[in-house]
Amino acid sequence: MAIVGLGTDIVEIERITAHVARSGDKLAKRVLTEAEFDIYQQHSQPSRYLAKRFAAKEAAAKALGTGIGRGVSFQHIHIGNTPDGAPTIDFTQGAQQRLALLNGVVGHISIADEKSYAIATVILESR
């Protein structure tokens, strides 16, 4: 296997908190898949959850080489968790098509947060 994509993103959590205070769930509905949005609504720290998902999806889009847009939307990238809590990443639609163009077969993701920031790194591997 070879690395075919690498992306990292960092988000200031307070920016997300301020956006949610101003616009309600508008950003969350744009960024999160339906399943992620359900978790967001029940989360004890929804802005922190949203910031981590935002960073993860931006990192994934960078790893794909497109950024958000150009055929890849936030909705095409789903961030989940294993039963042990480790983050997982799944691609659909435009993101899956772009991954296939790179001969990618799997994405690895790491997400971290500390007080003011959320950060994510995505590595894409080929066959």
UniProtKB/Swiss-Prot annotation:
GO molecular function terms listed in the Swiss-Prot or TrEMBL record: holo-[acyl-carrier-protein] synthase activity; magnesium ion binding
GO cellular component: cytoplasm
GO BP terms: fatty acid biosynthetic process
Predominant place of localization: cytoplasm
Cofactor names: Mg(2+)
Residues that bind Mg(2+): D9, E58
Swiss-Prot/TrEMBL keywords: Cytoplasm, Fatty acid biosynthesis, Fatty acid metabolism, Lipid biosynthesis, Lipid metabolism, Magnesium, Metal-binding, Transferase
SUPFAM superfamilies, sorted: 4'-phosphopantetheinyl transferase
InterPro entries referenced in this protein's UniProt entry, alphabetically: 4-PPantetheinyl_Trfase_dom, 4-PPantetheinyl_Trfase_dom_sf, ACPS, Ppantetheine-prot_Trfase_dom
E.C. numbers: 2.7.8.7
Reaction catalysed by this enzyme: apo-[ACP] + CoA = holo-[ACP] + adenosine 3',5'-bisphosphate + H(+)
Location within or outside the cell: Cytoplasm
Stored Gene3D superfamilies: 4'-phosphopantetheinyl transferase domain
Protein family (similarity comment): Belongs to the P-Pant transferase superfamily. AcpS family.
NCBIfam families: acpS (TIGR00516), pantethn_trn (TIGR00556)
Function, in words: Transfers the 4'-phosphopantetheine moiety from coenzyme A to a Ser of acyl-carrier-protein.
Name of the protein in question: Holo-[acyl-carrier-protein] synthase
Organism, scientific name: Shewanella sp. (strain MR-4)
